[in-house]
A protein has these predicted regions:
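Extracellular beta-propeller repeat domains
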Residues: 1-188
C-alpha cells in the first residue's frame, strides 16, 4: 500500500475468483489507520484494465498507477486518482508494440513496474514490453499526461544492453537506474 500525504493508506485489491469465475473486479481502496475504516474508491473495469502496479503519489498530490491492458488499444494506460476530487482519470493510453496506427511503439502491458517522479518533475516508467523489438522501453511524460517520450527502446542486437526492464527505476543524483531480466556479463 501507499501512505499518502493525507495520512490514508491506498491500495488495489486483486480480483476475486471462485471455481474459475470472477466474483469481483479489482478495486482502488483507502484505509484510515486511525479509525480502521476501509473505503472502496473505484471499481476497475474493461476500459481501465488490470492494475497491478505499485501506486505512486506525485508532488501534485495525485496517485499514479499503470494498467496492463487498459485504454483504447488494450495495451496499457497510465491513470491518476485525484485526492481532492476523488476522480480517476486516464492520462495516457499506450499504443503498444507493432500497432498499425502511426505513432511510437511505446510501452505495452506495464503490469507491475512502478512509476517514479524524478527531481525534474517528470513521471518515468520502465516497461517489460514495448519498443522497437518489444523487449521493453523506458519513457517519461509530464504529470498531466502530456509530452510522452520514449527514452530508450531495448533491443537484443545492441551490445552491452539488457532487455525486459523489471523492478522500476531509482533516482540517485541526476541519473535513473534500473535492472533488466535479460543481459550479458556486463549488464546482468
Amino acid at each position: 500500500p501507499l501512505l499518502a500525504s493525507n495520512g490514508l493508506l491506498y491500495g488495489v485489491s486483486e480480483s476475486s475468483y471462485e471455481n474459475g469465475s470472477v466474483l469481483g473486479s479489482e478495486k482502488l481502496f483507502s484505509y484510515n489507520p486511525v479509525t480502521g475504516v476501509f473505503n472502496t474508491l473505484y471499481d476497475f473495469n474493461l476500459s481501465t484494465g488490470t492494475v497491478q502496479s505499485k501506486l505512486m503519489q506525485a508532488t501534485n498530490r495525485k496517485i499514479y498507477m499503470t494498467s496492463a491492458d487498459g485504454g483504447f488499444y488494450k495495451r496499457g494506460s497510465i491513470m491518476t486518482y485525484d485526492l481532492t476530487t476523488n476522480a480517476l482519470a486516464t492520462i495516457y493510453v499506450s499504443r503498444g508494440y507493432n500497432n498499425p496506427d502511426p505513432g511510437p511503439n511505446d510501452f505495452e502491458r506495464a503490469a507491475n513496474n512502478p512509476l517514479i517522479q524524478a527531481s525534474n518533475g517528470k513521471i518515468y516508467l520502465a516497461s517489460k514490453f514495448g519498443g522497437n523489438g518489444n523487449l521493453g522501453v523506458t519513457s517519461m511524460l509530464n504529470p498531466d499526461g502530456s509530452s510522452y517520450q520514449i527514452n530508450d527502446s531495448f533491443e537484443s542486437l545492441l551490445v552491452n544492453q539488457g532487455t525486459v526492464p523489471a523492478g522500476g527505476l531509482l533516482q540517485i543524483g541526476e541519473f535513473l537506474y534500473g535492472t533488466t531480466l535479460n543481459g550479458d556479463d556486463v549488464n546482468f
